[in-house]
A protein has these predicted regions:
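An N-cap/entry alpha-helix motif that binds or orients negatively charged groups
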Residues: 1-16, 24, 28-46
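Structural preference for beta-strand elements that scaffold enzyme active sites
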Residues: 23-25, 56-58, 99-101
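Conserved, mostly hydrophobic/aromatic
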Residues: 26, 51, 93, 102
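A cross-domain feature marking catalytic cores of carbohydrate-active enzymes
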Residues: 28, 61, 104-106
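Active-site mouth loops of central-metabolism enzymes
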Residues: 29-43, 71-80, 109-113
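Catalytic domains of carbohydrate-active enzymes, especially glycoside hydrolases
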Residues: 44-65
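Alpha-helix-loop-beta-strand connector modules within alpha/beta enzyme cores
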Residues: 74-101
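Non-globular sequence segments
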Residues: 105-133
Protein backbone atom coordinates (compact mmCIF):
# COMPACT_ATOMS: atom_id res chain seq x y z
CA UNK A 1 0.00 0.00 0.00
CA UNK A 2 1.25 3.46 -0.89
CA UNK A 3 2.59 5.48 2.08
CA UNK A 4 0.33 8.42 1.26
CA UNK A 5 -2.69 6.10 1.39
CA UNK A 6 -1.79 4.71 4.80
CA UNK A 7 -0.98 8.12 6.21
CA UNK A 8 -4.45 9.34 5.17
CA UNK A 9 -6.12 6.19 6.53
CA UNK A 10 -4.75 6.81 9.99
CA UNK A 11 -5.46 10.55 10.13
CA UNK A 12 -8.34 11.82 12.26
CA UNK A 13 -11.64 12.43 10.50
CA UNK A 14 -14.44 14.82 11.41
CA UNK A 15 -17.96 14.87 10.02
CA UNK A 16 -20.24 17.35 11.74
CA UNK A 17 -19.96 16.70 15.47
CA UNK A 18 -18.50 13.22 14.98
CA UNK A 19 -14.74 13.09 15.46
CA UNK A 20 -12.95 9.83 14.69
CA UNK A 21 -9.33 9.12 15.64
CA UNK A 22 -8.76 7.54 12.21
CA UNK A 23 -10.66 6.51 9.07
CA UNK A 24 -10.84 2.81 9.88
CA UNK A 25 -14.31 1.34 10.46
CA UNK A 26 -15.07 -2.12 11.80
CA UNK A 27 -18.03 -3.58 9.93
CA UNK A 28 -20.80 -5.32 11.87
CA UNK A 29 -20.40 -9.03 12.55
CA UNK A 30 -23.23 -11.05 14.07
CA UNK A 31 -21.58 -12.89 16.94
CA UNK A 32 -24.56 -14.15 19.01
CA UNK A 33 -22.87 -13.46 22.38
CA UNK A 34 -25.84 -11.93 24.20
CA UNK A 35 -27.64 -14.03 26.80
CA UNK A 36 -30.88 -15.95 26.20
CA UNK A 37 -32.91 -12.78 26.97
CA UNK A 38 -30.93 -10.92 24.26
CA UNK A 39 -29.10 -8.88 26.92
CA UNK A 40 -25.52 -7.85 26.05
CA UNK A 41 -22.87 -9.60 28.15
CA UNK A 42 -19.49 -8.73 29.67
CA UNK A 43 -17.71 -10.63 26.90
CA UNK A 44 -19.25 -8.19 24.42
CA UNK A 45 -17.79 -5.22 26.32
CA UNK A 46 -14.37 -6.89 26.23
CA UNK A 47 -14.69 -7.76 22.54
CA UNK A 48 -15.67 -4.26 21.41
CA UNK A 49 -13.33 -2.52 23.86
CA UNK A 50 -10.29 -4.35 22.50
CA UNK A 51 -11.20 -3.27 18.97
CA UNK A 52 -11.67 0.40 19.79
CA UNK A 53 -8.52 1.43 17.92
CA UNK A 54 -10.67 1.40 14.79
CA UNK A 55 -12.05 4.90 14.34
CA UNK A 56 -15.63 3.62 14.27
CA UNK A 57 -17.06 0.30 15.40
CA UNK A 58 -20.46 -0.79 14.13
CA UNK A 59 -22.08 -3.32 16.44
CA UNK A 60 -23.44 -6.65 15.45
CA UNK A 61 -27.05 -6.75 14.28
CA UNK A 62 -29.22 -5.69 17.20
CA UNK A 63 -32.96 -6.36 17.37
CA UNK A 64 -35.07 -3.26 18.02
CA UNK A 65 -38.05 -5.40 19.05
CA UNK A 66 -38.73 -8.94 20.28
CA UNK A 67 -40.54 -9.66 17.01
CA UNK A 68 -37.27 -8.98 15.17
CA UNK A 69 -35.03 -11.21 17.28
CA UNK A 70 -35.06 -14.24 15.00
CA UNK A 71 -31.56 -15.50 15.82
CA UNK A 72 -30.63 -16.98 19.17
CA UNK A 73 -28.54 -14.74 21.45
CA UNK A 74 -28.41 -11.63 19.25
CA UNK A 75 -28.51 -8.49 21.38
CA UNK A 76 -31.62 -6.38 21.63
CA UNK A 77 -32.59 -2.86 22.67
CA UNK A 78 -36.30 -3.29 23.43
CA UNK A 79 -36.02 -3.84 27.20
CA UNK A 80 -34.59 -1.72 29.98
CA UNK A 81 -32.21 -4.57 30.91
CA UNK A 82 -30.83 -4.65 27.36
CA UNK A 83 -30.37 -0.88 27.18
CA UNK A 84 -28.58 -0.88 30.55
CA UNK A 85 -26.32 -3.75 29.47
CA UNK A 86 -25.17 -1.80 26.40
CA UNK A 87 -23.74 0.94 28.67
CA UNK A 88 -20.61 -1.05 29.72
CA UNK A 89 -20.05 -1.92 26.05
CA UNK A 90 -20.14 1.69 24.90
CA UNK A 91 -18.09 2.77 27.93
CA UNK A 92 -15.36 0.22 27.11
CA UNK A 93 -15.15 1.54 23.55
CA UNK A 94 -15.26 5.22 24.53
CA UNK A 95 -12.71 4.74 27.33
CA UNK A 96 -10.33 3.21 24.77
CA UNK A 97 -10.78 6.22 22.49
CA UNK A 98 -13.17 4.66 19.98
CA UNK A 99 -16.65 5.48 18.76
CA UNK A 100 -19.45 2.97 18.42
CA UNK A 101 -22.70 2.88 16.47
CA UNK A 102 -25.46 0.30 16.50
CA UNK A 103 -26.59 -1.79 13.55
CA UNK A 104 -30.35 -2.25 13.85
CA UNK A 105 -31.41 -5.63 12.50
CA UNK A 106 -34.97 -6.96 12.26
CA UNK A 107 -34.72 -10.53 11.00
CA UNK A 108 -38.15 -10.62 9.34
CA UNK A 109 -38.81 -13.85 7.40
CA UNK A 110 -35.34 -15.14 8.22
CA UNK A 111 -36.62 -15.52 11.79
CA UNK A 112 -37.26 -18.92 13.27
CA UNK A 113 -39.93 -19.10 15.97
CA UNK A 114 -37.72 -21.32 18.17
CA UNK A 115 -35.09 -18.55 18.38
CA UNK A 116 -37.55 -15.82 19.31
CA UNK A 117 -38.55 -14.74 22.82
CA UNK A 118 -41.77 -16.21 24.19
CA UNK A 119 -44.79 -14.40 22.79
CA UNK A 120 -42.89 -12.90 19.86
CA UNK A 121 -44.27 -13.27 16.34
CA UNK A 122 -42.55 -13.46 12.99
CA UNK A 123 -43.30 -10.15 11.28
CA UNK A 124 -42.29 -9.53 7.69
CA UNK A 125 -43.60 -7.99 4.48
CA UNK A 126 -44.26 -11.51 3.13
CA UNK A 127 -45.82 -14.63 4.62
CA UNK A 128 -43.48 -16.77 2.52
CA UNK A 129 -40.71 -18.25 4.66
CA UNK A 130 -37.22 -18.66 3.27
CA UNK A 131 -36.50 -22.17 2.01
CA UNK A 132 -34.19 -24.42 3.99
CA UNK A 133 -33.60 -24.82 7.68
Amino acid sequence: MDVSMTSTLFKPYTMGDLELSNRVAMAPMTRCRADQAHVPTDIMATYYGTRASAGLLITEGTAPDANGAGYARIPGIWSDAQVEAWKPVTKAVNDAGGKIAIQLMHTGRVSHQLNMPEGATVIAPSAVALPGK
